[in-house]
């Protein structure tokens, strides 16, 4: 389960070049399973494979047919996945789920469950936080990084990225930590926080930019072929 508790927008200076997702051989068994899953979403307003919190509530006058799905190889494993995104709902209900086909059950299984602010990269997801209620201010919109684990056929949390602006506070009462002036060697007035495996570390701007380049250099966002969750589009998956 991959669901950071925060929200969207990042500043970019230019539109990134987007690469197309791979075009795997069509698997009609998988598509039939995706079709059944989408009918559960469309007809029953339920998320498949989420028995405890599976109800979908769409705010009127919108309907489920205003929400989106895509069938494409998003994780790069050579097989198609089903992506379903619901955003016209209460904040906690906004989510995107990536489903893979499970040939053992002839059904679907969840590869990723996250907030809707997702940018897809080959083998990687960047998920914008749903809120920015910490100390980041305008420096950064918090985000998480997850990597595709081929052995597990699912995405695994890797990093959570936040920032701390000294103008907002010079003391974190939650962790009882003073602002790390020793890290902010350029006196920018802010530092970045990288959480990995439950361990948080601070970085100054120069170190963060190097770290960020290591994550994103040579990675282009994938173009996801989104379409509306309509009966016609669902029926067209398998003819």
Model-derived regions: residue spans:
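Beta-propeller blade repeat segments, especially FG-GAP/WD-type strand-to-loop junctions
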Residues: 93-111, 146-150
